[in-house]
Amino acid sequence: MCFFLGSRLAYAENIDGSSTISNRDISGSLNIGINKDANIDINGTVNIKDYFSVATCNGQSSTCPEGGLNASAKIDKSASVGASVTIVGDSSKGELNIDGGSTLYTQQLWVSGNDNDKTSNVSDDSNGSLSINNGSNVFVVSSQDDTPFKTNSVKWNQNIISQGNNITDGTVSSGDLVLGKTGNGIIDIDNNSKLDVKNDVVVSTGVDGIPNEKPSEINIKNESNFSVHGDMKGGISAAGKLNLNMDNSSNLHVDKNIAVGIGRESNITVSASRESSIFSDGNFTVATGNNSNANLKLDASNLSVNGVSTIGSGDGSITKFDIKNGSVVTSSSDMTLAKGKGTQANINISSSELNTGSLSVGEGDNADVKMTGSGASVSSKKTFTVAKGNNASATLNYTGSKIDIGSGYIGEGESAKTQLELNNSALTASGKVFIGQGNTTQTNLTLNDKSSVNVSGEMSVAQGSSASVDVTATNAVLSADSLSLGGGEAAKVTMTGSGATVSSKNTFTVAKGNNASATLDYTDSKIDIGSGYIGEGEAAKTQLELNNSALTASGKVFIGQGNTTQTNLTLNDKSSVNVSDEMSVAQGSSASVDVTITNAVLSADSLSLGGGEAAKVTMTGNRATISSGNTFTVAKGNNASATLDYSDSKINIGNGYIGGGEKAQTVLTLKDSALAATGDVIMGQGQETQTDLTLSPQSSIKVSGNMSIAQGNAASAKVIVDNADLSANSMSIGEGDTAAVTMTGNGATISSGNTFTVARGNNASATLDYSDSKINIGNGYIGGGEKAQTVLTLKDSALAATGDVIMGQGQETQTDLTLSPQSSIKVSGNMSIAQGNAASAKVIVDNADLSANSMSIGEGDTAAVTMTGNGATISSGNTFTVARGNNASATLDYSDSKINIGNGYIGVGEKSHTLLKLDNSTFHAAGNIDIGKGSSTIANVSVGAGSNMSIKGNASIGVGDQAKAKFSVKDSVLNIGSSLVLGQGNSTEAEMSVEHSQLYSGGLLLGTANNAVVSMSANNSEISVVGDYTVAKGDGSEATLIYKNSDINLGNGILGAGSGVKTDLSLDNSKFVASDGIIIGKGDNAITNLSISDHSVFKGERINIGNGSYSKNSISITGNSIFDFGSSQESTIGEGDYSQSLVTINDASVYGDGSLTLAKGNNSFAVLNLQDNAVTNANNISLATGLGSKAIVNVSNMNSGQFNPVSMGAGDGYAEVNFDGVNGYTLSTNFICMDSGSCADTVINVNRGTVSLSGTNDWKGQINVYDGTRLDARGNDAVDGILNVSKEAQVDFNGYSQHMTGIDNKGMIYLSDGSASSDVYLDKDYVAHDGSGVQFGIFGQKEADVMHVKGDTSGSSGIVVTTNSKNKIKKGGDILLVEVNGDSSGSFYLNSLIKNGKEYKVTGDYIDVGAWEYALNKKRKNWYLSVDMRPEPGAFINNSKSMLDMFALQRYDIPGQHRYPTLFENLYNNGMWIQFNNNSGSNSEVYDNLKTSYSLNTMMIGGDIYNWTDGYNYSHIGIMGGMGSAANKTTSTNNKRATGNVDGYTLGLYHVFQQNISDGLNESERQGLWTYSSIQYMDYDNSVSSTNNFKANYGVNGFRLTGEVGYLKNIGGIQPSDFYVEPKLYLSHTELSGGVVEDLQGGKITYPNSLTIIEPGVFFSYRKTHESTSNDEAMFKDYIKQSVVDAWFGGGYSFKTGNYSRTNFDSDMVEYNTSDNFALKSGVEFEFLKDARLLLTSSYSINNDRNLSFILGGNYYF
């Protein structure tokens, strides 16, 4: 029964027959053909409230007449019809024609059926047919409001809208069109017409259980359009049948999905031609049931799907798809064709395009697909699936085409067959491609003539058991991201190529499966792959031959993978295999591979050959290049064997694995070849492996990574390196139990940059023997494992490790390490030897080096270590551990060696025994060191002669309860940077001795625990502790410290701290100096014995001794020793209450800039004995400061020392200081009395000896300086008291100013020594007693010590004056010594003068010392020292002046030298001459202390001995001699006089040269250049005497050189007279030498001894000649020829240098005025007798020395 039957019959207008309806509104339904055939025309506007039905039999098929009925309705002539629901042909044949531009509006449209009770008495011919023609339209709308009838008075009935009615999805609604529910429906849209469906179109639904037999039809032609705004879908029947025909630019547009023919036996035909278009904005699903047929033909048309396309799917379906003539099929998502079992698909694309997201064709078992194309373009962006299913077959044949896919699946399934042939075509896949996937598949892939297969993803061909594939590429390209061919058991692959390019960027898999076989034969080809898998599987066989071809893989390559595989790899003549990643060949049990390389290259990132049990690998090569950038694996498996034999070849690998597996055998031989590995190399891995590695000369193995050989139990390795290189980043040889390794080398270079492991395993053994070799490693592990045995011998060889080295690791291991001369082991990291319980190590280093960052030898319980060395160098920069473990033992014995470590642990463990012995060796630790650390340990350290032990950190020896430690240092140096701990632990015993050595430590701790017993001795040593020096710190502890001839410097000292502690410290000629504090005997009832003797020093910035109550302290400082308490204000001796302290300083010193308190505790008692030259130069010593305390200071028998107390008897204490038998003792800085009161109980007595007052002192009280004693002031003092100086006593103020009340002087007071000025101020009187004296110092001109007496003077004191050569007096005068303001009754007399430490006694009333005379005079009340210069220096200076001037001649001082030629002269005659000279003058001392007059007389005679002339120039030589005398008289400022006398003679030679002497008598005229030179010897006798009874005689010799040059020029005149000008230069040098002269006191006197004169000058001369004409003169005609007068006047300026005016009198320099002088000279020479001349000259010198001289001489020629 129809669900809406009642509504359709109520208010209905039923028409049977023919009729016309125009312009009507029907309030009910309009039913055409209810019981009979009917035919109706509708014109105008008709609005129907309910149903508009044609041939519906009232909606019930049983009511239809037998055979059915026919009814039709035509809406024409632009009519407009509206109806709520329109039904055409419900179980009868109905036709609705809309023509002539008419329009139908309806909310639901049913074409062929709305009934659910279809019966068999009505055939499918009873269809409904809808025809829309000639520009007409049908609109299936949602409501009346969407139509022109929205304002019509007749409103459409919404209640009759069908909501279900067995539609497939269970629902229909307004806006839906249903086609072919109860029979096939037909819709024709023609001639520019339109069908517009607002919601869904339901196609060919049928009735449940009764499918339609004929397909419904939709015909869209001639530019018509069918628009569906919802889905286009099928109904509920088992099959859907539809024929869709489109032609001539027609369009089907579905806004959502198309899903028709979705039941079994569906039959869908789609035909579109002439630019028609089908568009689905959703999915496109047609004929998807079993046994369905889909036939799509596109001819110059388009199919466009915006969703998923599914065509002809279902078992047994047949799909034909013909796309041609420029057609385009586009499915933006997936497209599936013929999916199901037994499907058939025939896809032909000719000059057209197929574009889809994913394309699946013939997916199902037994599917048969044929795809052909010419000029085709196939694009499947996602997947491309063809014939996927068992027994499926695919034939693809394309010519001139392009196939662009995403992923591809072709011929996939059991026994599938695939034939893919490309001719000048390209298949391009952006994803994966699978071809022939399945067992027993058969695949033929043929690429011809520039064809290509380019797969961006994986390409898999013939995958399955017994699958076979034949790939032939001729001048073509096969490319895939991954390429897999023949995968499965018994797969068979044949690949041939000529000029081929095979590319598989990711993987390349060939014949992968058991019993698979692969034959690859390429010539002139290129194979570029990613990863490769060839011949992989049990018993697989692979034959790969390349001839002039290249296989390149960017990834991995696997060949012959599987048990019993057989692989032959042959590379000939310039062929290459280049694998960027791993290459694996013959992997599997009993797999075999034969690799032959001849002049070719095999390269891989990783290369693996023969992996598996009993695998067999043979690799040979000549001129081969093998590269494996990552790994290189050969014969890896139990019982595997590898034979590698290369000559003239290069093997470059990354990681290498050769002969790995139990009982594997490896033979690697390199001849003039190189193996280089950038990664690891592992050889002979496995139990019982045997590995032989032989490197012949010029060969090398260089492994950048790790190299492992013979790894496994019972593995053995034999490595021979003969003048070759073996290197690796890490190297492991023989790793496993009972492994045996033999390594020998001569001229070998072994390098292992990271680790080097040899014979590592229980019972393993290693023998390494190298000579003239180098071993460079990183970390080393040799002989590791229980009971492992290691022998390492280096001869003239070096082992260097940049990391760690571990040898003999394991229990009961035995390790022997021998380094022969010139050998070395250098480990940059840690070195560990014999680590394990009961392990033993023997290390011998003979003139060799052993070094490591950290070194551990014998670490484990009962470990035993013996280390010996001679000339050894041991270095362990970080830690050095030897015999670390309970009951371990260590013996280290080194001589002439060097040991440098970081932290050290030697013999650490309970009951360990340690012996460390150094002899002439150095031991340096940059960190800490523990020796014998643990309870009950025994440690013995001996640092012998010439050794140096340096620990930068802490050193612990014998640390632990009941530990025993002995540390001896002899003739060595010990340097501990931090702390030295010796014997730390309860009841420990520690003994340390340092002899003739140096010890430096940051801290020193000995016996720091309860009941510890420690001792330390040092002799001739230096000990320096920067930090704490702690000894016996613990209750009941005992410490004995004995230091002889040693220096101990420390920071803080704690010696004996604890209750009842006992400390004995003895210093003998030693220094114990703390930069901070020293605490001794800290604790109640502590006992301290401190003995400091024989030039020892005990010093601390703070010293506290006996801090506890009832402490007993005995301190003895003797033998010129020093006790220095430093700068702290808290040093104490006897700080505890009731403490008793005895401090004896005997011939020793106490210093301190801070404070020292003796007897600080209440009721404490202290005695300070300063004896036998004790010195207390302390700034702040307090005595008896506690309540009821008492302190006594006894200073006795002292030659030197210092005492600086600042507080004595403070509070209620009592103190006194007694000096008895002191000499040079010092009482220093700011001494004040204790109670700040009258100091009535404070007495300072200088009973015997010498006491110094140092610093600026201010005190009260009595100071008594008794007979035979001396008190020195070392500062400026102020004394509120009387200074009593007893007879035979001395007080020395040392140049410091003193201010005191008064002086009672019976002894001697020294103001200064002449080096510093002292002023003494007395507020009251100076009382002198007979025999008393005062010494004053003078410091120069009127500077001296002065005593200022405000009161009176009485008695008589002698005065001593002291000075030195530094205190210069320039001019005599009076110097104040004593100033008296009161009564000056006292007298002073001059006793002596001390100069430069020598005393000169008074002579009469004066003292002559040096150049000065001293006398004491009283003027008014004051006393002065008069100082005057002695006269004798003036006599000595003028004696020398006379000697330097005497016998000095210039040319014109010789008579006859002004001679001119005359008419009567014989120019060549020689002559004799005689000359007399008188010279006198006066001079004075530079400060006018002396004035002198002098005179000089000489007579000289000479003669020419030879002359010569050339007629113009004239020369002659002469000799000369003479004698002379001189006298002088000097007067001083105090009218003392001295005279000097000189007598002497001279001998000499002279020479004269004169230019321009004519031999013509009347023409002669002398002018031109002339020279004069002479040499002279002088001898003098001298004497000096004075009114001071001084007399001295001395002889002097002299030598003089003279030179003179001039030029005589005539300046005109009238004969017989002429005028001349004559410039000249005179030079002279005179030297004197003679004996030493001494004054009366024995002082040396020097005198002037050299003079150099340079005197330029000019003379003007006049000549007058008169010839005799008188007869009266005739009688003299033989003698008187003519008279000649030569007169001259001129001068010169004399420059003088040399010592010619100074004398030194016993270091006093006296100098006379000197200056360069201007000398005026004049003279006249007469010739009035034949051949005779007379000379008279005079000269006057103008300077400080007024000098006048005259010369008279004569000359005669003969």
From Swiss-Prot:
Keywords, ordered alphabetically: Cell outer membrane, Membrane, Plasmid, Signal, Transmembrane, Transmembrane beta strand
SUPFAM superfamilies for the chain: Autotransporter, Pectin lyase-like
Predominant location: membrane
Domain Autotransporter: 1465-1758
Record localization: Cell outer membrane
Keyword S-adenosyl-L-methionine in annotation: no
Gene3D superfamilies: 2.160.20.20, Autotransporter beta-domain (2.40.128.130)
InterPro entries per UniProt: Autotransporte_beta, Autotransporte_beta_dom_sf, Autotransporter_pectin_lyase_C, OM_autotransptr_brl_dom, Pectin_lyase_fold/virulence
Membrane topology recorded in Swiss-Prot or TrEMBL: Peripheral membrane protein
Signal peptide: 1-12
Cellular compartments per GO CC: cell outer membrane
Protein known as: Uncharacterized protein YuaO
Species, as recorded: Escherichia coli (strain K12)
Gene: yuaO
